Amino acid sequence: MHQLTRRDFVQSAGLSILATACCKRSDAVAIQPAKSGVMLYSRPGTPTENPEPGLHPLGLGTGRDGFIYVPPTYTPLQASPLLVLMHGAGQSAREFTGGSLGEIFDKDAIVVVIPDSRSPTWDMIYGEWGPDVRFIDRALDLAFTRCRIDPNRIAVGGFSDGATYALSLGITNANLFHTILAFSPGFVQPAVKTGKPRIFIGHGRQDEILPIDLTSREIVAALKEKNYPVKFEEFDGNHTMTREEVSHAVDFFMGR
């Protein structure tokens, strides 16, 4: 079976114009008001469960669901950082469950929530917030019920469309997310601005899917013009999310 790639999805959905046109510096961080469905309401509290370490299904959706990763270094005696991590178009949370990414999160006892989008990509990419925000809110509520989370160390991140969504959702919900980690984003389109989170953006110079000149370089310039604290790393590579970039992003998240 042919796997839907980010290129296939953007072209078939007619979104390639959107992914570049939204990145002219004058409107790269422009507010796109939404009627409703943009805010996250779950907040950390006192957990009522004692989770087993490891990767566990969220158990919140049929078909498309996601995972929560509880590192072996987690202890309920100390509040942990939390990262919401979002996949690219045509992918799923499972894209993040292979390899050795867990080792990067284990060092700092970072709890990771990895939701699936309700459709092939995230709702805002289609131009309407709602279903994915509600699902992420439920996933956060589950994480806060299971794990003791530091309210001052909550981040949202993602790759490709997931990075676009992380930037947009994170700025919209900056009263929850203090840090945004975006790997190869296409654009940023918050519904409202609730604060100025710290932002890490990494992007490959040879990216042919979302060319860096049309995306991250414009996004970063626009964010800096609006006084967002941004760290931008360009690397030699294509449309990918490397272990090295993830490690750098986690260091940024943890203030190193």
Question: Which positions does each model-derived feature cover?
Answer:
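A domain-start/cap signature at the N-terminus of enzymes
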Residues: H2, V10, G14-I17, C22-P81, ...
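Serine-hydrolase catalytic machinery in alpha/beta-hydrolase-like enzymes
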Residues: G59-P72, L77-C147
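Loop/turn elements at helix/coil->beta-strand transitions in domains of secreted/extracellular proteins
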Residues: A79-P81, D108-V111, D150-R153, N175-T179, ...
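Cell-envelope and extracellular/periplasmic
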Residues: H87-A89, F144-C147, F159, A163-A166, ...
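Alpha-helical scaffolding within the catalytic cores
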Residues: F96-G102, F183-V192, R217
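Primarily recognizes the serine-hydrolase "nucleophile elbow" in alpha/beta-hydrolase
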Residues: N152-G195
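C-terminal catalytic histidine-bearing segment of alpha/beta-hydrolase fold enzymes
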Residues: G202, E208, D213-V220, K224-R256
